[in-house]
């Protein structure tokens, strides 16, 4: 069964512009693009609104009948600037972390780094309102992802780039998001 005009869910951040440009300007390829934050990409794919998707890497293992379809990804070897932990004190003094709800992968990554690199065990909270950033208390840190980092990074004394922290801890690159399709879906 061929998908005549595929629906493609992709992240609506600056780092996907090369992918979006390629999809929109490939002369022989038509697709409906669904651009949204990472968590919404997953929802669009899971609920069947997208045939192909750029999904948070952390979401893929839980998706049945899904396969990674290319080596292209949103990944990094070193700093990315758009996936950060912000605080007014050093990470060793962090007691509470407020988590950006837009990326399951980044939430898992900061949890790994807290336990294995920084050796801290903070309390975890959802960052339900970005106004919370203005009311940080001593020991608070904020996981932010995407373009919104640019609006807030200068308001804090400490900024930990999670991709750089991952590489320092593991000596490996990090994949934040990968291209997937349902098994059996033609995608070339």
Give a label for each model feature.
Residues 1-76, 92-93, 138, 165, ...:
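N-terminal hydrophobic or amphipathic helices and topogenic motifs
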Residues 11-13, 100-102, 145-147, 182-183:
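Structural motif
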Residues 15, 106, 110, 175:
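Catalytic-loop motifs flanking and including active-site residues across diverse enzymes
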Residues 22, 82-91, 96, 174-188:
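A bilobed periplasmic-binding-protein/Venus flytrap-type ligand-binding module shared by bacterial periplasmic
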Residues 22-25, 68, 112-113, 156-159:
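Short, glycine/charged-enriched secondary-structure capping and boundary segments
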Residues 53, 97, 142:
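Receiver (REC) domain switch-region micro-motif
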Residues 72-131, 160-167:
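A conserved helix-loop-strand patch within extracytoplasmic ligand-binding domains
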Residues 126-188:
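Pocket-lining segment of extracytoplasmic ligand-binding domains
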């Amino acid at each position: 069964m061929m998908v005549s005009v595929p629906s493609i869910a992709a992240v609506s951040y600056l780092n996907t512009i090369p992918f979006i440009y390629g999809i929109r300007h490939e002369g022989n390829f038509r697709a409906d693009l669904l651009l949204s934050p990472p968590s919404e990409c997953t929802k669009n794919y899971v609920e069947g609104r997208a045939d192909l998707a750029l999904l948070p890497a952390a979401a893929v293992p839980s998706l049945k009948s899904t396969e990674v379809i290319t080596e292209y990804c949103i990944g990094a070897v070193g700093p990315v600037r758009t996936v950060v932990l912000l605080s007014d004190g050093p990470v060793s003094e962090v007691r509470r972390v407020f988590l950006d709800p837009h990326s399951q992968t980044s939430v898992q990554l900061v949890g790994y780094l807290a336990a294995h690199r920084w050796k801290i065990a903070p309390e975890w909270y959802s960052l339900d309102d970005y106004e919370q950033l203005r009311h940080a208390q001593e020991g608070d840190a904020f996981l932010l992802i995407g373009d919104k980092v640019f609006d807030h990074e200068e308001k804090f004394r400490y900024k930990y780039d999670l991709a750089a922290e991952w590489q320092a801890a593991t000596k490996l690159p990090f994949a934040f998001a990968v291209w997937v399709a349902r098994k059996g879906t033609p995608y070339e």
